[in-house]
């Protein structure tokens, strides 16, 4: 049987199924991975001391919405890619639009700063060296769980499915990382948060090529 014929047969079988297995499995991955990340945030990094005050401000929720939407984009992509012949196009479009909007806001914030030093302060914040690596570490447990779950599904684009799972994981854990992170600028968010999420995506894509092959 040719590969295209096999994919078509699997897609037909998947279409006849009545149980939403991928959404249910991905929800379980998000739940377990989110709990693991939350425990790491609270036990290792600890919540920011002014959290009670921070949640009253708009930027705390802007960060959560941004990373949450990145996670949603990754979920939509991996949910489709977990099925034979899926492309994840809707997820990619949402992710690109969300990142683009944040990047534009970050660039505008930087170029309207009074001077170069102020722009660099927006970019570096207080934790630019540690932000992306910490998001990466927080997301590894969820990414590992997600790749394991994908092995029980039927992705026909393993590298892309792994990349989407990495973005899903990164969005979830970056949202929880906001409980610790004191940064509050679009410039910082667009660069360092996004890099942490992207790093998980790249690792997921690399691992998926090997772990999710048929």
Curated annotation (Swiss-Prot):
UniProt keyword annotations, A-Z: Cell inner membrane, Cell membrane, Membrane, Stress response, Transcription, Transcription regulation, Transmembrane, Transmembrane helix
Segments on the Periplasmic side according to the record's topology features: 47-53, 112-134, 180-185
GO CC list: plasma membrane
Places the protein is found: Cell inner membrane
Record's protein name: Anti-sigma-F factor NrsF
Induction: Slightly induced by potassium dichromate (K(2)Cr(2)O(7)). Induction by Cr is partially dependent on sigF. Probably part of the sigF-nrsF operon.
Membrane spanning residue stretches: 26-46, 54-74, 91-111, 135-155, 159-179, 186-206
Keyword check for Transcription regulation: yes
Homology family: Belongs to the NrsF anti-sigma-F factor family.
Membrane topology: Multi-pass membrane protein
Result of knocking out the encoding gene: Cannot be deleted in the presence of an intact sigF gene, a double sigF-nrsF mutant is viable.
Cytoplasmic topological domain: 1-25, 75-90, 156-158, 207-214
Chain's role: An anti-sigma factor for extracytoplasmic function (ECF) sigma factor sigma-F (SigF), which responds to chromate and cadmium. Overexpression leads to loss of response to dichromate. ECF sigma factors are held in an inactive form by a cognate anti-sigma factor.
Domain of life: Bacteria
């Amino acid at each position: 049987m040719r590969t295209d014929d096999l994919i078509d047969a699997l897609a037909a079988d998947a279409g006849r199924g009545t149980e939403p297995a991928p959404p249910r499995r991905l929800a379980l991955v998000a739940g377990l991975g989110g709990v693991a990340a939350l425990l790491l945030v609270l036990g290792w990094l600890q919540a920011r001391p002014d959290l009670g005050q921070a949640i009253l401000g708009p930027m705390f929720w802007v960060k959560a919405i941004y990373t949450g939407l990145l996670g949603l984009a990754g979920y939509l992509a991996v949910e489709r890619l977990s099925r034979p012949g899926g492309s994840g196009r809707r997820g990619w479009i949402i992710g690109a639009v969300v990142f683009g909007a944040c990047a534009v806001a970050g660039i505008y914030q930087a170029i309207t700063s009074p001077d170069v030093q102020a722009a660099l302060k927006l970019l570096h914040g207080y934790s630019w060296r540690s932000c992306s690596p910490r998001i990466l570490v927080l997301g590894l447990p969820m990414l590992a769980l997600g790749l394991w779950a994908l092995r029980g599904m039927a992705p026909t684009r393993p590298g892309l499915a792994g990349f989407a799972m990495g973005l899903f994981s990164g969005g979830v854990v970056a949202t929880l990382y906001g409980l610790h992170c004191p940064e509050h600028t679009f410039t910082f968010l667009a660069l360092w948060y996004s890099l942490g999420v992207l790093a998980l995506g790249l690792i997921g894509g690399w691992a998926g090529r090997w772990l999710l092959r048929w």
